[in-house]
């Protein structure tokens, strides 16, 4: 399994990894790995006896050793040569085995470091922001290679990241931390994205359009339309979150079924168009709204559009 710790900078994600690895001592509580207590206020099993692999942000490859020598360094009499050869084959660097780390690209160094961390067959592998130093195009390639390698290795993994989409791509279970280091919600990527428990979790997976108001008659009136609310929120002050992809637009000179919006800007972002809209609230004051539409949707500035809401991309919480 691949479990992710997702949270903002300063929330204690890396510190937790160090505690699990035995690089720091716990001040309270316990850490249990495979049924064995490895850390408590009265016990501290040394790092080298925990059978844990650790991939650091800077990779920590030995600069004086070749790729092959780096990979073979963690092995001992208990490790079969076939396991080493299998891992070497998986990293797809047949022509680089005799090179030194400084002769490799960032992505190649990352693959070698990952392979070295799993070649000794650890019970648990810890990854600390493993893709943060890579540029966007290389990050996607290396992330895909990493997932493939981890699945092939059949090792349990805990990965730390502040990138929600990276967490969704590579893990099958996510724990969301708040700034204090508390776990706010845990679950599969699908659960957390589609069933967030509060505004914090909702916002962690990207920008949302937010509107506040009071529920009346099982509905709340927003600048982008009337939204049905759960029955248990009647009379409550609530905040409505609508993801940009939940704001659907039609090119209409006048609204037919929805609410009128005016296009302030339309920007092609590659796979989608980012539309910046202005709408009027109940007090005739301008409110700004963001929409993500298919790339071919590119309305002119100042043009009128019709707004409709996708309820599946709408989330309502007590304020």
Regions found by a protein language model. Give the residues of each.
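The feature captures the beta-strand-to-loop junction immediately N-terminal to the Walker
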Residues: 6-8
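Helix-to-loop junction immediately C-terminal to a conserved catalytic motif
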Residues: 21
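Short beta-strand immediately N-terminal to the Walker A/P-loop
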Residues: 3-4, 54
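ABC ATPase nucleotide-binding domains
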Residues: 51-53, 66-200
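Conserved ABC transporter NBD signature motif
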Residues: 29-40
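Conserved coupling/switch loops of ABC nucleotide-binding domains, chiefly the family-specific signature
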Residues: 27-30, 179
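Non-catalytic connector elements of ABC transporters
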Residues: 208, 219-319
